[in-house]
Each structure stands twice: as C-alpha cells, then as structure tokens.
A protein has these predicted regions:
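Active-site-adjacent bridging/hinge elements
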Residues: 1-3, 43-44
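SAM cofactor-binding core of SAM-dependent methyltransferases
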Residues: 11, 23-125
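Glycine- and acidic
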Residues: 6-14
C-alpha cells in the first residue's frame, strides 16, 4: 500500500478518518462556540482551520472548513463567530474562498487566507484577544513548528 498525499487525491473524498473528524467538529464546535461565546465580550468567538483545503468536497459534502462555517451559521443568532480558513494550495484556496464568500453573504464573518498557517497565527491570536479561540490544526498540519504555536 502506498501512502496517499494531498496531491494524489487524499482530499478528493471523505475518508473514514475525515468522517470521524467531521463528526467531532459537527457536534463539538457549535457547543464550544455557544458556551464560550455566551460569556465573551460581544458574544464573540474566533475559529481557525489551519489546513482548510477547499472547504467542500467535489461531491458537495462539507469538509472541515465548511464544517466550521456551518457551526457559525447554526448559532448565528446568539453568537458572533469569526471563521478564519487557511489553505496553502492555490487551486484549493480559490475554491475555499468561494465557499467562505457564500457564508459571508449569509452574514457569517468568514475569511479565507492563502499560504502557510504559521504566517497567520499572530493575526489570528490578535483578532481573538480577549475572546475564545479554537485552533484546528489537523493531522495534515503535523509540520507546524511547535514554536510557532507556543510563541503566540
């Protein structure tokens, strides 16, 4: 069996590990944001997906980026959730930007960023000053330098 990387189609469809990961996001994120946002300044919470991919699978099913956007939409009336999505692959970033724009039109604060997540951590932490922050750095992010996470 040969390892399958992102360029070989790993992100083309939801695999069992992704299905499990997305189930956790579906059940945990709305609760996290609603519970922590209830007591936060302006009822505000910041969510980051550091390896968002294109946000949605080609078959239309939500990937991790869209899972965050769906969580924000679910609690939109009571909590202001700011969603930041980072993707380094340009082609996937373009699709991710379109997905984020869809939710922005629905009143969700959503922004897609192109590049390495390490380049955006300072900005994310700055935006989340004084409010709850959920950093999602999934297994694809195994190469994130520990120092980049701990310095912020």
């Amino acid at each position: 069996m040969v390892a399958k990387g992102t360029s070989a189609g790993l992100l083309d469809e939801a695999r069992s590990q992704s299905v499990f990961k997305h189930a956790i996001l579906q059940s945990y994120l709305p609760r996290f944001a609603a519970m922590t946002g209830k007591w936060a300044q302006g009822n505000r919470v910041v969510l980051l997906d550091g390896f968002a991919g294109r946000g949605r699978y080609p078959d239309g099913k939500p990937a991790s980026g869209e899972q965050m956007l769906l969580a924000a939409r679910k609690i939109q009336r009571t909590t202001h959730v700011e969603v930041m999505l980072v993707e380094r692959e340009h082609k996937d970033f373009l699709t991710l930007s379109d997905v984020a724009a869809e939710y922005s039109r629905l009143g969700i604060t959503a922004e897609a960023f192109h590049g390495e997540v390490e380049n955006y951590l300072d900005e994310v932490v700055h935006r989340a000053t004084g409010v709850p922050l959920f950093l999602f750095l999934d297994p694809c992010g195994a190469n994130v330098q520990y120092e980049a996470i701990t310095k912020t």
